[in-house]
């Protein structure tokens, strides 16, 4: 085995070791049997014109962790709460949770915005509003421990949305999160006011919590599906091709660099041998 082949083999082994290590880390950290989910829609994108690292885009694979695992590490926080603690995930404040989406056949992966406790008498309490510096209002009461009627927020999330929901419209009086997708165009309001779900997302409704993204890791799977192929935007597929080309370029540079070293070593050897050639 020549030197160039050895370097290539070492590079491949390092890559495989990195992938294996990441897989093991994900398995241990997630505490789930199925720790990956492919994003099939654009509801969490921050821009509809291009893909971004650190943001959940169409075709990304998302690494999941169990609710108990995330809670034990303090990694389940609403947007309102996280504004006060500084906790951020996927380009904004608060946690991104995965929950069963009512009539939707796929689970929903959206951001938790605020937790509401049901008081049992037709009112709701939101303790995280105690130190919230943003603008909010409620038609039934300005007491955050006895909310009723229409709850509204002004200029929230990275998209600067104005959102609201009628607390009296919920079909289940259960404590839980109000949720919303990050997309500034397609997800302009709470899920609970967008025909996605009709009640707060309680702990029993949450399947898992998003931990990290694998950019464009699910594009090939979506391209093979008749149901979701149209969701893969051109820029997302181009981003995957760019990533593949990057790996090819790196390996090519390693290969040609080593070939140059081998050639240089061979020429030096010939030069030394020629000194003894009479």
Where are the regions a protein language model picked out?
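Membrane-proximal loop-to-helix boundary features in eukaryotic membrane proteins
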Residues: 216-240
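Juxtamembrane interface at the cytosolic side of transmembrane helices
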Residues: 2, 234-278
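Surface-exposed intrinsically disordered loops and tails
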Residues: 77-88, 121-176, 189-198
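Short amphipathic alpha-helical surface micro-motifs
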Residues: 17-22, 91-94, 157-162, 182-192
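Alpha-helical transmembrane segments
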Residues: 4-15, 240-243
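Extended, compositionally biased low-complexity polar/Lys-Gly-rich tracts
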Residues: 59-63, 94-99, 107-111, 167, ...
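Extended, hydrophilic extramembrane loops/domains of integral membrane proteins
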Residues: 169-225
């Amino acid at each position: 085995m020549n030197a160039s082949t050895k370097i290539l083999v070492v590079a491949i082994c390092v890559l495989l070791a990195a992938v294996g290590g990441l897989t093991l880390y994900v398995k241990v950290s997630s505490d789930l049997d199925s720790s990956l989910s492919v994003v099939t829609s654009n509801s969490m994108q921050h821009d509809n014109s291009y893909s971004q690292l650190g943001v959940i885009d169409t075709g990304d694979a998302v690494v999941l962790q169990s609710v108990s695992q995330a809670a034990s590490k303090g990694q389940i926080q609403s947007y309102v709460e996280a504004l006060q603690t500084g906790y951020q995930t996927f380009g904004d404040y608060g946690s991104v949770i995965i929950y069963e989406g009512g009539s939707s056949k796929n689970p929903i992966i959206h951001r938790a915005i605020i937790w509401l406790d049901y008081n049992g008498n037709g009112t709701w309490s939101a303790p995280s509003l105690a130190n919230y510096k943003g603008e909010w209002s409620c038609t039934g009461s300005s007491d955050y421990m006895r909310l009723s009627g229409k709850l509204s927020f002004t200029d929230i999330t990275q998209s600067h949305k104005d959102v609201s929901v009628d607390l009296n419209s919920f079909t289940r009086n259960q404590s839980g999160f109000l949720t919303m997708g990050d997309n500034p165009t397609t997800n302009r309001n709470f899920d609970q006011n967008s025909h996605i779900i009709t009640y707060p997302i309680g702990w029993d409704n949450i399947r898992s919590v998003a931990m990290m993204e694998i950019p464009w890791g699910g594009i090939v799977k979506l391209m093979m599906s008749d149901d979701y192929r149209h969701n893969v935007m051109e820029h997302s597929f181009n981003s995957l091709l760019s990533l593949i080309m990057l790996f090819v370029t790196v390996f090519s540079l390693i290969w040609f660099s080593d070939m140059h070293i081998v050639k240089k070593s061979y020429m030096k050897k010939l030069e030394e041998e020629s000194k003894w050639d009479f």
